[in-house]
């Protein structure tokens, strides 16, 4: 059981809850802890051997999730646990002597990567949400976003990561990775994620972002011509709602036809807006703006984890037990 220090105990109950405390208490209730722990438990070292006992699996998983929510590196996570009682309480850490060091935190992430935990976590979260009535429906929206990578790294030769690439968007060059997602057009939940180098065209990944039961596929004008591609021919019959390129709109001369076309484009755009929400959560709320690791595999694992957590975060209000308003 967790012991509270006098300082912790004094702080509790008297003051206003901080945003961090409110967020973590909500996450405490909506994360499917039992299912996630069951995925890792078979691979986690068990206590009972001589020497130092491993940290509780629940503590290590909680620390791993805290790193995603607050964009903390391993050393920054260790420091934050020393400095912030709220994070210690969430991680179920008793005293300051029980805080895992940065190497232990790193090794736990390596263990998760080795066993492909991130992809299974996204599946487990979505299965959990489906049981709560947030299931995938008949349409998928596809989109991609750029995640910048550092243009030099701290390795010996200061070279750029060979698995990242440069791409041009507008008049700017970006170096890094691209995250492609498939999102349910009713619930807004992310169900498929692919990460590639930044110079890979969005359209080439679209076929990997479908769950296979959808009737409609929406995307921006970067997906123009998707229905003609060979890899889509093998998919079930889909209704494609792809945005027109602005240059196409300029070619419409008939005023009535132009008005109708603009209205139709607006309708498609308002449907596509759902795909922006998960990107906003991971970038703005979780602060994920830069690639953290070297190579695509490690970064893909992090992005999968972030989208599993953004799904929970976006649906937390529906998942939280309705608290009866107290009549004072």
For the regions a language model picked out, list residue spans one by one.
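Polybasic low-complexity intrinsically disordered regions
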Residues: 1-6, 57, 75, 79-82, ...
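Charged, often Cys/His-bearing segments associated with DNA-binding zinc-finger transcription factors
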Residues: 1-34, 38, 321-328
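Helix-centered, glycine/charged polyanion-binding patches within enzymatic domains
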Residues: 7-10, 215-216, 221-301
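Secondary-structure capping and boundary motifs in well-ordered enzyme cores
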Residues: 29-32, 52-59, 97-101, 267, ...
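Amphipathic, well-packed alpha-helical segments that form the structural scaffold of globular domains
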Residues: 37-45, 126, 279, 283
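An N-terminal domain-cap segment
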Residues: 39-58
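N-terminal core-binding DNA-recognition domain of tyrosine recombinases/integrases
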Residues: 48, 71, 112-113
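Alpha-helical support elements that line or immediately flank enzyme active sites
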Residues: 59-71
């Amino acid at each position: 059981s967790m012991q509270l220090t006098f300082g912790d105990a004094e702080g509790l109950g008297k003051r206003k809850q901080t945003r961090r405390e409110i967020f973590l208490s909500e996450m405490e209730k909506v994360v499917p802890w039992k299912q996630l722990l069951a995925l890792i438990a078979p691979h986690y070292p068990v206590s009972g051997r001589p020497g130092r006992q491993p940290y509780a699996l629940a503590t290590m998983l909680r620390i791993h999730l805290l790193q995603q929510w607050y964009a903390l590196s391993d050393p920054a996570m260790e420091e934050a646990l020393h400095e912030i009682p709220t994070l210690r309480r969430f991680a179920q850490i008793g005293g300051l002597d029980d805080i895992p060091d940065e190497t232990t935190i790193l090794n736990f992430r390596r263990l998760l990567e080795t066993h492909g935990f991130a992809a299974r976590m996204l599946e487990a979260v979505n299965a959990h949400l489906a049981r709560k009535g947030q299931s995938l429906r008949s349409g998928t929206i596809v989109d991609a976003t750029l995640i910048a990578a550092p243009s030099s790294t701290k390795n010996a030769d200061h070279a750029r990561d060979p698995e990242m690439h440069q791409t041009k968007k507008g008049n700017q060059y970006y170096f890094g990775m691209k995250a492609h997602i498939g999102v349910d057009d009713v619930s807004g939940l992310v169900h498929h994620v692919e990460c590639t180098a930044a110079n890979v065209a969005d359209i080439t990944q679209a076929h990997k972002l479908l769950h296979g039961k959808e009737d409609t596929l929406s995307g921006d004008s970067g997906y123009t011509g998707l229905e003609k591609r060979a890899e889509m021919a093998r998919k079930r019959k889909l209704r494609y709602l792809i945005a027109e390129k602005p240059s196409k709109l300029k070619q419409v001369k008939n005023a009535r036809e132009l008005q109708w076309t603009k209205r139709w484009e607006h309708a498609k755009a308002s449907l596509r807006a759902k795909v922006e929400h998960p990107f906003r959560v991971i970038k703005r709320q979780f602060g994920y703006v830069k690639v953290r690791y070297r190579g695509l595999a490690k970064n893909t694992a992090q992005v999968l984890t972030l989208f599993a957590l953004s799904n929970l975060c976006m649906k937390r209000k529906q998942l939280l037990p309705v608290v009866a308003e107290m009549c004072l």
